[in-house]
A protein has these predicted regions:
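N-terminal targeting/export leaders
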Residues: 1-112
Length: 112
């Protein structure tokens, strides 16, 4: 199980806007490249919008996948990621974007 795997990193994502109480956790294994997200608190992104996770390496974003707000979904498996120094979540049009909408960044992790 990824949470108990000693090779898995757990990264806490905190709100970009410190007045908000949004949170998520990313579980990432750099060897198997598996990536999961566990949503702790996020609002509905709005009509025609969806959340997207980004892996950041030297400031360059890589699409880690789009995800839905959980009802009973628990952790959601996203794309395999080769390398990441940091993680971010943006609100994007449904289906995701090739590049992050930086003005719509809602969560970010500290550097790993």
């Amino acid at each position: 199980m990824l949470m108990r795997d000693e090779n898995a990193k757990v990264m806490m994502l905190m709100p970009v806007d410190s007045t908000k109480h949004f949170q998520a956790r990313v579980y990432w294994n750099k060897y198997s490249r598996e990536t999961y997200i566990d949503i702790l608190s996020l609002p509905d992104p709005g009509e025609g919008k969806q959340y997207q996770l980004w892996a950041l390496t030297a400031g360059n974003p890589v699409d880690a996948g789009i995800f839905i707000l959980p009802n009973d979904a628990g952790m959601q498996r996203l794309k395999n990621i080769i390398e990441a120094d940091q993680w971010a979540v943006t609100i994007e049009p449904t289906g995701g974007s090739l590049n992050p909408s930086l003005d719509q960044m809602i969560l970010i992790s500290k550097n790993s």
